[in-house]
Amino acid sequence: MKFDVLFGGVSFEHEISIVSAVALKKVLGESIGNFIFLDSSHRFYLIPLDSMKSKLFSSGDYKKCTEIFLQRGAFVKKTFFGFKPIIPHTLINLIHGADGEDGSVSALLDFYHLPFIGPRIESSVMSFNKVFTKIFAAQRGVKVLDYEILTRANPHLKHIAYPIILKPARLGSSIGVSVINEEKELDYGRDLAFEYDDTIIAESFKSGVKEYNLAGCRVKNGSQDEYRFSIIEEPSKKELLDFERKYLDFSRTAQVLQADISSALVAKLQENFMKLYENAFEGALIRCDFFVIDDEVYLNEINPIPGSMANYLFEDFVGVLTELAYNLPKKHSIKVSYKYIEQIHYAKGK
């Protein structure tokens, strides 16, 4: 099976998406049919596989590549005789941050009837906004850390105790994130987060907690639904991954080691993953990052499009992607009818 990779987008994570796409090329190799770049002007470009290097984009030379356009069922390119479809494959949405994870691209691909791997509109909106994610997780029976919402109109903490972590509500990759240990540090952290978003989430910061990452998706095996789980990773013990470390994290291609944890904890993490995934993220390969505090599992965040789609957590990443591509959700078909208009005209004719 071949995949087309859509990357770029207009977001603070634009460069990360490029790095992620270059890494995915190393992992998928000949399984990639086309690379499609969405630039900062929302124009699509067809990038030759042998040109997929980060310098192409930073230099602006990507504009020398073929510009392509969306039509129903396919991307097309202009020719002397009109528009010619590019052979379509299952598309991988690899746009991190806004455009890719906020539901914009999902809506566009759905509208033009292009099959794609990635979060759908509702799950994009829910997971892109950290406040919505907290509400969603609580409704699904998954625990979250204590938090408050700060806005420009109401920027004051009410009850949460220091230390805290401040995050822009709609941003990833540790951009605009800071740990606040005491009140005198609050103004700086708040100003930093407000540079990126008008809403901030303030969470209790627990140092020394165990953190585990688990990726996966749901597919069908015959008539049965089954989950394809990755191994569970215990990430770096560094207090907070800064942007540069997250940037490098998105370029990973070597498989990591399974965390040394009990089978009971594995089952707990997988159970919480399923609570979040079911009837929400079908068609997407997601990664959930969890905290474990006093043997209780808490959701840290949902990554609806993890860096290089968390290939480094899977033993058979291509196999999982292929299974998922054959199990994409189908929209209910709506038959448009004009019977009421016809009845009105018929009645008027009388």
Swiss-Prot record:
Binding site for Mg(2+) 2: 301, 303
Pathway annotation from the record: Cell wall biogenesis; peptidoglycan biosynthesis
UniProt keyword list: ATP-binding, Cell shape, Cell wall biogenesis/degradation, Cytoplasm, Ligase, Magnesium, Manganese, Metal-binding, Nucleotide-binding, Peptidoglycan synthesis
Record field: catalytic activity: 2 D-alanine + ATP = D-alanyl-D-alanine + ADP + phosphate + H(+)
GO terms classed as biological process: cell wall organization; peptidoglycan biosynthetic process; regulation of cell shape
Gene Ontology MF annotations: ATP binding; D-alanine-D-alanine ligase activity; metal ion binding
Signal peptide: none
Pfam families membership: Dala_Dala_lig_C, Dala_Dala_lig_N
Domain ATP-grasp span(s) in chain numbering: 134-337
Family annotation (InterPro entries): ATP-grasp, ATP_grasp_subdomain_1, D-Ala_lig_Van_CS, D_ala_D_ala, Dala_Dala_lig_C, Dala_Dala_lig_N, PreATP-grasp_dom_sf
Entry cofactors: Mg(2+); Mn(2+)
Cofactor binding, note field: Binds 2 magnesium or manganese ions per subunit.
Top EC class of this enzyme: ligase
UniProt-recorded name of the protein: D-alanine--D-alanine ligase
Originating organism: Helicobacter hepaticus (strain ATCC 51449 / 3B1)
Classification lineage: Bacteria, Pseudomonadati, Campylobacterota, Epsilonproteobacteria, Campylobacterales
